[in-house]
Regions:
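Basic, short loop/linker segments at the boundary and entry of helix-turn-helix/winged-helix-like folds
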Residues: 17-68, 102
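Structural motif
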Residues: 48-56, 163, 283-291
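Polybasic low-complexity intrinsically disordered regions
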Residues: 50, 64, 77-80, 90-91, ...
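Helix-centered, glycine/charged polyanion-binding patches within enzymatic domains
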Residues: 207, 213-286, 290-293
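Charged, often Cys/His-bearing segments associated with DNA-binding zinc-finger transcription factors
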Residues: 1-34, 38, 304-313
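Short, well-ordered loop/turn and helix-capping segments at boundaries between secondary-structure elements
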Residues: 67, 81, 112, 226, ...
């Protein structure tokens, strides 16, 4: 397939800007992008009769869109205008950049080839190798994300106690308890119970598993046990006799779990507050899954950069 060659001309910057690395420059050097490019080798995002844009450049641009919560239109405008965006994607100073439809075609190709999981793994495996701590446990939880439209037949209604039901998808996430890096995830319609889908959010190595009371029951417990893990699940009741200290034991058990488990809420907060994942941008489970994987990749890159810069973060 014919592809454009980009980055051949020299980028021109002032001497002041050249001496100072931007966050995107640091992220560019954080991993080896060649394995990512290899995963994208069969992707073609060309319009009819035109050479295709390099898929790695478009993929990097979509990460920028996550970090800055940009629509396709605003991403195309920003990529044409900002030197740091061009540098990160590999474009030189004065060459043309992709129009918004190129990102639409890339998403369609990623969904068609089923590459979201492979891209997530090839990036996360590199970041995990840079981890400066020894894994001791895994945080598992789910977050509800409103669907792009109530007419989306692949979403489902999710309600909780007295809260208003939301037409949504649900992201089930497993994160490292020490680094807060997302290691595994799956996406389901919003009406799928956390405990039933939680097994899909377990990484290969997970140690003790911290989760809230929604994960009580045999299904999730069996998924943890079959891989040799140890479940640490919030309980709502405990057997005891009148007058003993059962209630105190229950509170202590839950406190020890909650003070670790609650850290996964910071991940969801970043996704929704900073990365715009309060609502799905596109209809359908496949595109919703792609959006969550892109968000997780972008989050892991930024989180790893923070950890390497400040191990105590």
């Amino acid at each position: 397939m014919a592809r454009r060659r980009i980055g051949q001309a020299t980028l021109l910057f002032s001497s002041v800007g050249a001496a100072r690395q931007s966050t995107l420059d640091k992220l560019l050097g954080l991993i080896d992008w060649a394995p990512v490019e290899h995963q994208l080798r069969d992707v073609s995002c060309s319009a009819k009769g035109e050479p295709a844009w390099p898929p790695l450049a478009l993929f990097k641009a979509m990460l920028i869109a996550v970090w800055h919560d940009l629509s396709d239109v605003r991403l195309a405008e920003a990529l044409d205008d900002r030197a740091s965006f061009r540098r990160f994607c590999g474009f030189s100073a004065h060459e043309p950049t992709p129009e918004r439809t190129a990102f639409v075609r890339l998403r369609a190709q990623l969904v068609a080839h089923g590459l979201n999981q492979a891209l997530f793994e090839v990036v996360t495996d590199q970041l995990r190798a840079k981890a400066i701590t020894v894994k001791t446990g895994t945080l598992v939880d789910a977050t509800v994300i409103a669907s792009a439209s109530h007419a989306d037949p692949e979403a489902g209604w999710a309600g909780h106690q007295r809260r208003k039901a939301i037409h949504s998808f649900k992201a089930h996430v497993g994160a490292d308890a020490d680094t807060d890096l997302v290691e595994a995830l799956c996406v389901t319609p919003g009406n799928v119970h956390d405990g039933r889908a939680g097994g899909g959010a377990l990484p290969e190595v997970f140690g003790e598993v911290y989760a809230d009371s929604a994960y009580r029951g045999p299904i999730f417990g069996a998924a943890v046990a079959v891989r040799g893990g140890s479940p640490r699940i919030v309980q709502t009741s405990m057997w005891g006799r009148p007058g003993d200290d059962t209630l105190r034991k229950l509170r202590r058990w839950n406190y020890d779990i909650q003070r670790v488990r609650c850290r996964i809420e910071k991940i969801f907060g970043t996704w929704k507050r900073s990365y715009g994942l309060r609502r799905m941008r596109w209809r359908g489970l496949a595109k919703a899954t792609l959006q969550v994987h892109l968000t997780a990749i972008a989050y892991n890159l930024r989180r790893s950069l923070t950890l390497l810069s400040n191990p105590a973060a």
